Every structure is written in C-alpha cells, then in structure tokens.
Amino acid sequence: MVKLTPELINQSMQYINPCRERELDLRGYKIPQIENLGATLDQFDTIDLSDNDLRKLDNLPHLPRLKCLLLNNNRILRISEGLEEAVPNLGSIILTGNNLQELSDLEPLVGFTKLETICLLINPVSTKPNYREYMAYKFPQLRLLDFRKIKQKDRQAAQEFFRTKQGKDVLKEISRKSKMSAAAAIAAEAGNGKGRGSEGGRLANPQDMQRIREAIKRASSLAEVERLSQILQSGQLPDKFQHEMEAVAQNGAGHNGSGAVAMEY
C-alpha cells in the first residue's frame, strides 16, 4: 500500500483527457484512504482513484473545480455525508466494482444537485429490488445510471411507485437504515479519535484556506511555514490549529508585532 502524500500527487501523471478536462491519474497505487488532496490546489476537473484499496469515500477538501471522480475497483462500502459541500460541482461519479450494499448507503449522494452520471455496476446494491426506481426518484437531475439513460417515463414510474403504500414503506426502511448507518459511523469515528489526541479536527473550508495562506505570509520561521504549508496541502485542520487561527484573528498583527504565533503540536 502507498500513502497518498503531496509528493505522490505532484509526481503523478497529469494530462488533458479526451473530454478536454484536466485529469490527475492516481490509479493503481493501492492507496488505503483519501488524504492530502488539498495538494492538488483545485487544478483538476477529474481525479482518477481507480484500482486502489479505498474503503470509504471521505476526507475530500474543498475542490469546487472537480467535476468527475473515478473510483472503479476499490473496496468502498461507505460514503460520508456532507461531501457535497467539499465538491459542490461534482457531475459524475463512477463506482464500478466496489462494495456498496444497501440503497441507504447511497443517501449521502443525494446532496449532489449537479450529479448527472452515476455508475454502480458490480456493487451488491445494484441488484437490490427497486434500485433503478429509487435512483430515478431520489436523483431528479440524473441522466445516466450504470451507463443507461434514465428517461422521463422511468421518472414517472418511479414517482408513481413511491406514492403507493409499498413505495412509502420502502422509503421508510431506507431512511431507517441510513440513520442507523450514520449513527454507527459517527460512533466508530469517535472511538477511533480517542487515541489520537489532538489529531482530529475537520476539513478546511475556503475561508480556512485563505486564513492559512495569510498566516504563511506572516510566519516568522521556516518551521511555521512548513507546518502551515502541510496543513494547506492536506486540507485537514488539526484541533490545536483551530485555536492558533483564533489567536491570530484576535491578536491582529500577532505576538511581538511579527504576526507569528507559536505552533505547539
């Protein structure tokens, strides 16, 4: 397995694909988790993470340019909620050959209002009853599902089905499983965080990224610059770093007039 580092990102192949989009090729490294994608500096329309060892789709920094994620042949079984805030313009996600099991596992994708292409072939979920009807109902903007067009008659049939008692019961069951899955994920993450001390934190939003850039300009030592640059590239804010940013905001020019704040980790 290879860790997804800023160095790997910078060394990987970058090119203009046949759709005339700028693409980053991160295929086949057996990467176990998504991290440090902030190092892309939001320069890509497509990121290809196929043929890796991902189990969760999570930890995406703010990448408003990103329109397509290729995630074929991983082991993804969970999609984190709220990713639409990180990649609001995502229009295509290809998840062929993963391990998504239930229709409730797809609920986190509903927030992507520009998602027009989804592929879930060779996932257990694609064989579930009412799969295609559910997707047509939940994703009104979806045009291609598993490389087959969703037609207006498909949407109408889906809407009619989910108005029936059977359809409403199906939606209730999906919602129940989705809530259970989300609660289990939160509990698991909380448990994992107990031994990490201050390494938790959250994903950086655009305002955070701007504050980090300003802090880099004001840094008074190389160590501070390197630390801030690492955080900027990863897109992940450690807990203590949030306190440091608050100190910078409160103190204006910073300690001793230099704008530098001690970085204690």
From Swiss-Prot:
Keywords: Leucine-rich repeat, Nucleus, Repeat, Ribonucleoprotein, RNA-binding
SUPFAM superfamilies attached to this UniProt entry: L domain-like
Outcome of gene disruption: Embryonic lethal. RNAi-mediated knockdown in male germ cells, spermatogonia and surrounding somatic cells results in increased spermatogonia proliferation, failure to complete developmental programs of meiosis and differentiation and ultimately leads to complete male sterility. RNAi-mediated knockdown in female germline results in defective oogenesis.
GO molecular function annotations of the record: U2 snRNA binding
Protein name according to UniProt: Probable U2 small nuclear ribonucleoprotein A'
Assembly information from the UniProt record: Interacts with the SMN complex.
Matches recorded under PANTHER family: U2 SMALL NUCLEAR RIBONUCLEOPROTEIN A
Compartments it resides in: Nucleus
Residues of the LRRCT domain: 123-161
InterPro entries, sorted: Leu-rich_rpt (IPR001611), LRR_dom_sf (IPR032675), RU2A (IPR044640)
Cited function: Involved in pre-mRNA splicing as component of the spliceosome. Associated with sn-RNP U2, where it contributes to the binding of stem loop IV of U2 snRNA. In the germ line, has a role in oogenesis, by regulating spermatogenesis and nurse cell nuclei chromatin decondensation and dispersal, probably by regulating the splicing of proteins necessary for germline differentiation such as the meiotic protein mei-P26.
Keyword Repeat: yes
Source species: Drosophila melanogaster
Primary localisation category: nucleus
One Pfam assignment: LRR_9
Domain of life of the source: Eukaryota
Any single biological process term in GO: mitotic cell cycle
Signal peptide start-end: none
Swiss-Prot/TrEMBL LRR repeat ranges: 20-41, 43-64, 65-86, 89-110
GO cellular component, one term: precatalytic spliceosome
Gene for this chain: U2A
Gene3D superfamilies per the UniProt record, alphabetical: Ribonuclease Inhibitor
Family: Belongs to the U2 small nuclear ribonucleoprotein A family.
